[in-house]
């Protein structure tokens, strides 16, 4: 029992000592915390005082620094504005306006196009001295330039003149047929052909032994030419591309006239011989050669210039000479033209009917038929058969306001019928008419 008490007492003593030790440690920790809190508060006070001092210093020095910044900003603004104005003046003077001393007025023409038109053929440049010293080199150069231009066109259009298949031109036949049909309709409705031919025959200067010529029959046909077998070839004679087209027309184009042969010997109107002629073209076929040219590129010799001038003198008497002279001037100026001709192996068939006499009449005299047919063939050969050709100047293709049209819908109206060659026709206005939109 005594040992248990001793152990209990010892244990109690240890517990008490441990509690006291814990209280001491707790107290020491509290004291340390208080000391640390006081140190932190002191540091905060010091920092607060330092911040206040800095703010006071900044408030004292701020007016002086603001004055310096304001002055430097004003200087920069003024200098910047002046520099911008100076740059604008320099740009306007040297880049917008041209130098008046370097501007030399020149005549408008080909020289004005130098430096404006883009020239892509850079390999074909030659000095003026080379062209002036050697004329043959100039011809060779122009020939080479033309050949290279043709080669470039064929290359860029993927056309081989030697192996390319011929074309049918069906679409072109439709367009030509529409045009001819429109011309025939206008001729039937307005009698354009009759009045034109009648005025020509009336105003023509005839020999004394021929009386006035009267029209008896006009037939403008009802069929259309057929163009086919179109192929592009290189013309060796004129050094240009040509379109060769086969043309075939099977139709009846008739012109009938009536006149009188006068016998004025030994006295005027001693005898009168009535003559009636009817000439019909029933068949034409041949190879048409078409090409676009510049009238200044080649030497186009006018085959019948003298006779044309004589013909124009008659027109001058009627008041049309001004237009003819203007046409001559236009031809001298050059420009784009359509050149066409027919091959010598063409086929042209006629039917000539003649009736001579008043009571005892001679019908279809072979000599007269042969004479008229030969004259017509000669007239055609001298104008359209190779090596001669026709040149038709083309109008300008640039869009112009005066050529602008727009469709206008109109009511269908009819006018009193007209009679042409025994056939009555009425004028019909269709809704598809066009008017000038610039009116």
From Swiss-Prot:
Segments of this protein annotated with the region Disordered: 125-145, 309-336, 405-425
Pfam families named in the record: MMM1
InterPro entries: Mmm1, MMM1_dom, SMP_LBD
Source species, domain of life: Eukaryota
Annotated domain remarks: The SMP-LTD domain is a barrel-like domain that can bind various types of glycerophospholipids in its interior and mediate their transfer between two adjacent bilayers.
Role description: Component of the ERMES/MDM complex, which serves as a molecular tether to connect the endoplasmic reticulum (ER) and mitochondria. Components of this complex are involved in the control of mitochondrial shape and protein biogenesis, and function in nonvesicular lipid trafficking between the ER and mitochondria. The MDM12-MMM1 subcomplex functions in the major beta-barrel assembly pathway that is responsible for biogenesis of all outer membrane beta-barrel proteins, and acts in a late step after the SAM complex.
Name of protein: Maintenance of mitochondrial morphology protein 1
Source organism of this protein record: Candida albicans (strain WO-1) (Yeast)
Source organism phylogeny: Eukaryota, Fungi, Dikarya, Ascomycota, Saccharomycotina
Gene responsible for this protein: MMM1
């Amino acid at each position: 029992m005594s040992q248990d008490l001793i152990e209990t007492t010892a244990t109690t003593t240890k517990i008490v000592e441990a509690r006291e030790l814990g209280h001491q440690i707790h107290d020491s920790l509290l004291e340390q915390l208080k000391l640390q809190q006081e140190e932190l508060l002191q540091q905060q006070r010091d920092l607060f005082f330092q911040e206040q001092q800095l703010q006071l210093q900044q408030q004292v020095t701020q007016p002086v620094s603001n004055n310096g910044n304001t002055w430097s900003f004003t200087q920069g603004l003024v200098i910047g504005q002046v520099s911008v104005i100076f740059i604008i003046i320099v740009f306007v003077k040297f880049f917008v306006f041209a130098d008046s001393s370097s501007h030399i007025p020149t005549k408008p023409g080909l020289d004005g196009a130098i430096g404006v038109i883009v020239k892509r053929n850079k390999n074909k440049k030659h000095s003026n001295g080379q062209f002036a010293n050697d004329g043959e080199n100039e011809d060779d150069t122009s020939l080479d330039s033309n050949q290279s231009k043709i080669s470039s066109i064929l290359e860029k259009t993927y056309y081989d003149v030697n192996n390319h298949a011929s074309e049918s031109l069906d679409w072109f036949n439709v367009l030509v047929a529409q045009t001819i049909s429109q011309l025939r309709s206008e001729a039937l409705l307005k009698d354009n052909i009759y009045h034109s031919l009648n005025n020509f025959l009336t105003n023509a200067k005839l020999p004394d032994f021929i009386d006035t010529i009267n029209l008896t029959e006009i037939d403008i046909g009802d069929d259309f030419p057929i163009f086919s077998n179109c192929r592009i070839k290189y013309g060796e004679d004129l050094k240009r591309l040509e379109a060769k087209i086969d043309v075939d027309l099977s139709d009846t184009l008739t012109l009938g006239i009536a006149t009188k042969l006068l016998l004025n010997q030994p006295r005027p109107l001693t005898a009168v011989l009535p003559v009636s002629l009817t000439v019909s073209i029933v068949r034409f076929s041949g190879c048409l050669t078409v090409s676009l040219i510049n009238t200044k590129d080649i030497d186009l010799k006018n085959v019948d210039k003298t006779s044309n001038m004589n013909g124009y003198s008659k027109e001058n008497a009627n008041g049309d000479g001004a237009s003819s002279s203007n046409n001559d001037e236009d031809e001298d100026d050059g420009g784009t033209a359509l050149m066409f001709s027919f091959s010598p192996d063409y086929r042209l068939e006629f039917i000539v009917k003649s009736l001579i006499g008043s009571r005892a009449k001679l019908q279809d005299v072979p000599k007269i038929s042969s004479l008229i047919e030969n004259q017509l063939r000669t007239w055609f050969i001298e104008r359209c058969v190779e090596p001669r050709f026709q040149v038709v100047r083309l109008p300008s293709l640039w869009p112009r306001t005066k050529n602008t049209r727009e469709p206008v819908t109109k009511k269908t109206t009819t006018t009193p019928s007209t009679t042409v060659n025994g056939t009555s026709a009425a004028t019909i206005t269709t809704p598809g008419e066009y008017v000038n939109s610039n009116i």
